[in-house]
């Protein structure tokens, strides 16, 4: 259990990965707000009133995708300091550039990391 628990908004539609990440983060003493769609993430950002330390964001989501989510929060003043880390299966340079241009602090390709390393990397931004 960590001494400084963080709140992570997990936006991941892969059910198995979502559950595994929630388990790993909660095991470390962190609070996880888990959603499967970007639209739900926008609702959680409002209801959490600035309590989110970092967002784990998948790009390929049903409905609103990760880039559209980033574009939406990028234009809102109250989210200008929100740290968003992209965790995607896509390693396309174009996607990386767009995501960083919209304020993502990092872009991680899921296949490049074991789950524990992904979790630690995202937590490093919290």
Set out the residue ranges of the language-model regions.
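Conserved acidic carboxylate
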Residues: 12
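The feature encodes the CheY-like receiver
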Residues: 18, 62, 92
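Acidic catalytic/metal-coordinating carboxylates
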Residues: 37, 65-71
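Charged docking surfaces used in two-component/phosphorelay signaling
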Residues: 19-27
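Active-site residues of response regulator receiver
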Residues: 58, 88
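Non-catalytic signal-transmission and effector/linker regions of two-component phosphorelay proteins
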Residues: 1-9, 116-126
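Acidic, metal-coordinating helix/loop segments flanking the phosphotransfer/catalytic sites
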Residues: 34-54
